[in-house]
């Protein structure tokens, strides 16, 4: 029942979820207690492991026992056995535990004091919780169910997956929206809720609970990645704001009270999603993480995995690469776009690792080694002190003037000491080998701008974008292969085989069965993997489009080549490959869905932008601005800049906060309760193809055909079913063969059906009898004689 089994069902479901989550954190702590991961990262990795177990273990047994309670009990037993084995094999001595920070109470206080992002996470998490609470089939006083703006569409589809998997228990599952077709959509983001629904949780609780844990994993995974990469809490904080409170420059189109009022009154007329003004870069919280469960659960794995993999590359331990490979291999049926993005990120990072592994080494020791090496290499040339010290025996402006150390010198020295991996601390970043990363962005922007001009005249890029993308990727792979051969010629193959090699093998072992069983069969249609140029730009010049959509991060990205270290630019380089691929090809019928790739690239863009902002402040603000307006004034100015960059996002979040729409009428909800009580989970019910049809969403029953807004973008051939639905409503007496063809047991009739079809009610009486009726809604049972 979508109402749940009361307190008992809720407690059982919450307990089941908590057991997997808690045991996963225990496993993560045990496996990583001797590694150089903070306790926060250990628990984060453990929580991801627990959720992966909850998503995958029941499915392993479901192949034999279907998606039943038996499969879930066995899954829990498997998790318990795994905990026992890990606890038995992994012993953490007291000394190994003591080496980690943030172990005592006062150390935990320091954790919160040194990482103020916790405050922003708490506020944003509260917003997320409120939106889920007010948007997830909220019961109104009259018995109807309501939702919000962003969840008005996709939530119905996710409900149908959750309820049908749990109620029908068939595995592998089929589309309840198109019976007879294997469910190839990445359904693990929904099966995790199906497990809780099976335990007795209400549909609302089963839907919301896993999302609460997932959003925290997304928040923490992003922050840990940026901090590992850039090494500073302040930079990670700014990057976090730029990504999760993104807004762009769309607010400039809402320059009077009337237009601002429309933001909160119209359907999708916000500063981040306004088609008439070509505003397409949506607000992450509102339009990506709240309504799109696959994206949420995909990022909940991807972001912590990237942070974990970053440290694994630096540590070069086989165990860490095996763990990363297992998590990566589990991604395809959670979120295929995240898996594809991960592949591109790993390809770029592998290339960097083959060139210089020290790029991924973080910490003061590594910074000291780099600074010392740079100092030795640049201190003397031809017996003379270079520009980093003196020129021709005379102190430079950054060293001494008239034999005295200037305040600028001291300030620069302090900045360099505290930011050892930045450009200002080492002249090594200015070498010729680093120049490519400083020009890559501008070359890419020029390339796509020229492509856009050519495309406007003859649609060259729209026709041949896929071929251009394949050629570009092939050249990248060839260069990667060349670097790989050079690496193997100069170093031991074992060093690579037991890190990246074993990572690739583990990924393929876990991912290939998913790809062949589900993904490839559905992605083989003509509308998958095809040429498409410039994502969702509808008329703007290429650079202008991204300038107004991304706003401050794009401006800072343009400046980054002048202020950000080559090391940080290189590690953030995966966004270049992701952007190149996503701008030339589409990977499903909905072109817009390439933003699921672009937003992963934006993770690195926000990191680079945050680093650029910090560098600009430390190079120029600390010297010039502080003397004019004081340090507090500079900090306030920076805060105002970030606030302005987030105004569009705040307005969009405000719109989502107040949005309220009726999703299912009171009589429709009552009809669904009747259907759940009086029909079997495998009965097929004839309904309209409306996206918010309550029957598949609330009851999990199969219908003849669901909404084209779902089925078309999944690459399914639904058109004949859609035509037959109309025929069965408009000419039921002459459509008896269709009732037999689709094995229709019941007919659902409401204002949705009356408004969509010219319903022949008299004809319906010839094939079915009314068994339930309330207001405009009636349920009909097809006569047995139809099937004789």
Predicted regions: what they are:
Residues 354, 383, 413, 420, ...:
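Signature aromatic-anchored transmembrane alpha helix within multi-pass, membrane-resident enzymes
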């Amino acid at each position: 029942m979508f109402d749940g089994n009361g307190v008992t069902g809720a407690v059982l479901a919450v307990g089941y979820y908590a057991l997997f989550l808690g045991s996963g954190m225990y496993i993560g702590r045990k496996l990583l207690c001797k590694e150089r991961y903070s306790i926060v990262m250990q628990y984060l990795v453990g929580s991801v492991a627990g959720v992966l177990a909850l998503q995958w273990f029941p499915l392993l047994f479901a192949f034999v026992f279907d998606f039943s309670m038996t499969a879930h009990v066995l899954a829990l037993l498997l998790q318990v056995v795994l905990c026992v084995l890990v606890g038995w094999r992994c012993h953490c001595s007291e000394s190994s535990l003591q080496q980690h920070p943030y172990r005592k109470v006062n150390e935990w206080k320091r954790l919160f004091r040194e990482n103020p992002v916790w405050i922003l996470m708490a506020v944003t998490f509260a917003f997320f919780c409120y939106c889920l609470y007010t948007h997830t089939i909220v019961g109104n006083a009259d018995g109807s169910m309501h939702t919000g703006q962003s969840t008005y569409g996709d939530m119905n589809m996710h409900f149908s997956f959750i309820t049908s998997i749990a109620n029908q228990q068939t595995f592998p599952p089929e589309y309840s929206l198109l019976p007879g077709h294997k469910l190839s959509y990445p359904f693990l983001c929904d099966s995790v809720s199906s497990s809780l629904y099976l335990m007795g949780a209400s549909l609302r609780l089963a839907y919301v609970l896993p999302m609460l844990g997932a959003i925290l994993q997304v928040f923490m995974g992003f922050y840990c990645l940026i901090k590992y990469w850039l090494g500073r809490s302040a930079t990670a904080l700014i990057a976090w704001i730029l990504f999760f409170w993104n807004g762009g420059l769309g607010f400039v189109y809402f320059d009077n009270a009337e237009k601002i009022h429309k933001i909160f009154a119209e359907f999708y007329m916000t500063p981040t999603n306004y088609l008439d003004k070509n505003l397409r870069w949506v607000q992450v919280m509102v339009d990506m993480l709240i309504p799109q469960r696959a994206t949420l659960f995909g990022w909940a794995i991807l972001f912590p995995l990237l942070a974990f993999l970053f440290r694994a590359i630096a540590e070069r331990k086989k165990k860490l690469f095996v763990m990363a490979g297992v998590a990566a291999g589990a991604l395809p049926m959670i979120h295929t776009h995240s898996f594809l993005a991960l592949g591109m990120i790993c390809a770029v990072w592998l290339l960097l690792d083959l060139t210089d592994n020290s790029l991924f080494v973080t910490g003061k020791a590594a910074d000291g080694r780099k600074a010392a090496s740079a100092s030795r290499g640049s201190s003397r040339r031809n017996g003379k002190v270079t520009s980093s010290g003196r020129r021709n025996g005379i102190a430079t402006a950054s060293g001494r003037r008239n034999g005295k150390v200037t305040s600028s010198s001291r300030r620069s020295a302090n900045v360099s000491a505290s930011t050892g991996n930045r450009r200002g601390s080492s002249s090594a970043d200015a070498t010729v080998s680093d120049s490519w990363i400083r020009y890559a962005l501008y070359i890419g922007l020029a390339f796509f701008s020229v492509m856009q001009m050519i495309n406007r005249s003859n649609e060259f890029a729209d026709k041949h974008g896929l071929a251009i993308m394949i050629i570009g990727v092939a050249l990248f792979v060839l260069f990667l292969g060349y670097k790989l051969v050079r690496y193997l010629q100069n170093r031991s193959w074992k060093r690579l085989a037991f890190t990246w090699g074993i990572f690739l093998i583990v990924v393929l072992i876990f991912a290939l069965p998913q790809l062949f069983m589900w993904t490839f069969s559905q992605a083989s249609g003509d509308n998958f993997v095809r040429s498409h140029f410039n994502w969702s730009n509808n008329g703007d010049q290429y650079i202008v489009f991204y300038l107004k959509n991304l706003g401050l991060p794009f401006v800072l990205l343009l400046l980054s080549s002048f202020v950000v270290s080559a090391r940080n630019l290189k590690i953030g380089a995966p966004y270049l490959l992701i952007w190149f691929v996503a701008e030339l090809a589409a990977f499903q019928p909905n072109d817009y869905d390439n933003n699921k790739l672009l937003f992963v690239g934006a993770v690195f863009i926000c990191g680079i932008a945050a680093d650029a902002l910090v560098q600009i402040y430390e190079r120029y603000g600390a010297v010039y601005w502080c003397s004019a307006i004081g340090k507090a004034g500079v900090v306030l100015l920076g805060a105002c800049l970030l606030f302005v960059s987030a105004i569009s996002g705040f307005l969009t979040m405000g719109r989502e906060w107040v949005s309220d729409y009726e999703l299912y009428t009171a009589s429709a909800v009552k009809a669904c309760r009747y259907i759940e009580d009086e029909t079997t989970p495998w009965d097929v019910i004839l309904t309209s193809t409306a996206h918010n049809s309550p029957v598949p969403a609330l009851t999990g029953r199969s219908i003849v055909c669901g909404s084209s807004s779902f089925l078309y973008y999944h690459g399914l051939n639904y058109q004949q079913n859609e035509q037959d639905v109309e025929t069965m409503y408009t000419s039921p007496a002459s459509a008896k063969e269709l009732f037999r063809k689709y094995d229709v047991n019941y007919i659902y009739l409401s204002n949705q059906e009356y408004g969509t079809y010219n319903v022949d009610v008299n004809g319906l009486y010839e094939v079915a009898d009314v068994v339930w009726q309330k207001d405009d809604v009636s349920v009909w049972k097809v006569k047995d004689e139809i099937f004789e």
